[in-house]
Amino acid sequence: MLRWLIGGGREPQGLAEKAALQTIGEDQGQNPYTELLVLEAHRDIVRFLVRLDDFRFASAGDDGIIVVWNAQTGEKLLELRGHTQKITAVIAFPPLDSCEASSQLLLTASADRTVGVWDCDTGRQIQRVTCFQSTVKCLTVLQRLDIWLSGGSDLGVWNRKLDLLCKTSHLSDTGISALVEIPGNCVAAAVGRELIIFRLVTPTEELPEWDIIEVKRLLDHQDNILSLANINDTGFVTGSHVGELLIWDALDWTVQACERTFWSPTAQLDAQQEIKLFQKQNDISINHFTCDEENIFAAVGRGLYVYNLQLKRVIACQKTAHDSNILHIDKLPNRQLISCSEDGAVRMWEVREKQQLAAEPVPTGFFNMWGFGRVNKQASQPVKKQEENVTTCSLELIGDLIGHSSSVEMFLYFEDHGLVTCSADHLIILWKNGERESGVRSLKLFQKLEENGDLYPESP
């Protein structure tokens, strides 16, 4: 186990970022992750981490290898080989009944146009599905129906026995980029800038075969959809490459709230202008969502935004949370948020309430605090003035985990075992709660001394 010496801030990549980027010094009292364990097994970018159970996870990336790890000790348990190109999607497929004796499966899609199905307990490849016409970019499990979906240039429906139950016709050469399950035996699929709703028809006595039907195509986005996530049983959210965020009703598929930050290039641009516009577009790309019962947390370019569902407005934002694009975020207990970025950093944030004065400017830009949630609001309609004192929140940096030397692709949180991060530097880091680990080591030493009779030596 290595000891992590918490350093000061990193030097930002440019002077503009240096002024805006929030930093933290050596005093990181709310950051428990003071020890780290470096795990080495991959030979290329590690892009995916998936939780298998409370003590195991799997990693996969561009080397085509899948590795199963012990989240507590960092021990490599299994190495799964079978793909010839990079992994493009990974998902766990647990038994329908948690009491079943059958093993949990792991599904892995690859650029070699195959999907591997693995036994997580033995590492055996159960089957390699090879009938795909294009690369499968996303996998989704519908646990209730005990089936899984593969999204590529078409959408396929499969059972646990790996039978192809049904599939759609060719949808797009670019393929399905994201899938979520929504009520009514439906799924929402992001295909370019389109959101397509499909309904699954389950077998009956009259119709014994499975079927999948395209119900509706929604064209509300102006550019490619990058992120798609469920909010709750009645709503889901999508985000696009040009900063459009739409909240949808999961039952009738109508837009319930929207915010657009348009990017309109002029007809003629020189090379320098094109670079600047490209940078601007990246700054507003909605790269990832996570949600809880109260808020939507959005990674927008290099920034973080917290949108409250009840208040229908942004309650906190950190416009420059990282030096580069944020790739993954997740909400932790105790109002904490973790983000990882192309800048190689993993940062911990806390949502804190504060009293905003009337004179203090309201955050604008990506989210419009007043227009958000009012789909039919006319531009000429007067904006309601802010009350004298509005309780809002701030995102405060409470931890900066510096260990990777390249882009951090994603992370997993284990309540009992710490944080796991994967990176383009080919490494996985298991971040440990230093205080807890010290206590565990002391307890083991105490037990060892007691077993050897050295704890209470007899008097001469």
UniProtKB/Swiss-Prot annotation:
Claim: Repeat is one of the keywords in the record: yes
Listed GO biological process terms: autophagy; negative regulation of exocytosis; negative regulation of immune response; regulation of autophagy
Gene Ontology CC annotation, any one: cytoplasm
Domain of life: Eukaryota
InterPro entries named in the record: G-protein_beta_WD-40_rep, WD40/YVTN_repeat-like_dom_sf, WD40_repeat_CS, WD40_repeat_dom_sf, WD40_rpt, WDR41
Major localisation: cytoplasm
One Pfam family from the record: Beta-prop_WDR41
Function recorded in the entry: Non-catalytic component of the C9orf72-SMCR8 complex, a complex that has guanine nucleotide exchange factor (GEF) activity and regulates autophagy. The C9orf72-SMCR8 complex promotes the exchange of GDP to GTP, converting inactive GDP-bound RAB8A and RAB39B into their active GTP-bound form, thereby promoting autophagosome maturation. As part of the C9orf72-SMCR8 complex, stimulates RAB8A and RAB11A GTPase activity in vitro, however WDR42 is shown not be an essential complex component for this function.
The protein's assembly and partners: Component of the C9orf72-SMCR8 complex, at least composed of C9orf72, SMCR8 and WDR41. The complex is formed of two protomers, each individually consisting of one molecule each of C9orf72, SMCR8 and WDR41. The protomers homodimerize via an interaction between C9orf72 (via C-terminus) and SMCR8 (via N-terminus). Within each protomer SMCR8 (via DENN domain) acts as a bridging protein between WDR41 (via C-terminus and N-terminus) and C9orf72 (via C-terminus). The C9orf72-SMCR8 complex associates with the ULK1/ATG1 kinase complex.
Name the record gives this protein: WD repeat-containing protein 41
Lineage: Eukaryota, Metazoa, Chordata, Craniata, Vertebrata
